[in-house]
Amino acid sequence: MDTKELAFKKIFEANSKKIFHLCYGYTGDDDAANDLLQETFLKVWQNLDKFRNQALISTWIYRIAVNTCLTYLRTEKRQGKEEITPQLAETKREEFSEKNEQVALLYKCISKLEESERIIITLVLDEVPYPEIAEVSGISEGNLRVKIHRIKQKLTELYNQYERL
């Protein structure tokens, strides 16, 4: 293996799990999330020599993943694919084991958030440091903390609504 391949392997191992969760947060589908994960890391591989070290590499990869997910969602919307309906979401939720039901419900709630909120909360769930999230989001760290608080309140309301159904 040459140096680029070794570096890429380390980058993939360090970031793939978090990127998968990010992609899953956008799609709610394992297969689509895996496809987006592969597409993201293909772009990382193709552009690794263009990385300028002005930010953490994980920040750069998150940006690529977010853009890849957004492109995917726009394409899905244009193709008129079925949106997640309450019935489809319920079917998906039943596929999860009882242990994962709450996680599935949380992702369902996350999918109802605005795009910027989904990005932020997914990064928080992946335990990305706040300064890095602020950089990815393009907002100050103080503003980020306020947004996270509001997103958590919104998620709590959504979660409680769905739990009552």
Where are these regions (language model features)?
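Arg/Lys-rich amphipathic alpha helix in sigma70-family domain 2
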Residues: 50-52, 63-83, 99, 150
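Hydrophobic positions on the alpha-helical face of helix-turn-helix-like DNA-binding modules
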Residues: 40, 64, 120-121, 133-134, ...
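A short, charge-rich alpha-helical start-of-domain segment used by transcription regulators
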Residues: 1-21, 34
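Structural recognition of an alpha-helix C-terminal capping motif at a helix-to-coil junction
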Residues: 21, 35-42, 55-67
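DNA-recognition helix of helix-turn-helix
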Residues: 70, 137-161
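Internal acidic/polar
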Residues: 71, 78-103, 129-130
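Short amphipathic alpha helix immediately N-terminal
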Residues: 112-132, 136, 161
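Sigma70-family region 2
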Residues: 2, 41-56, 75-76
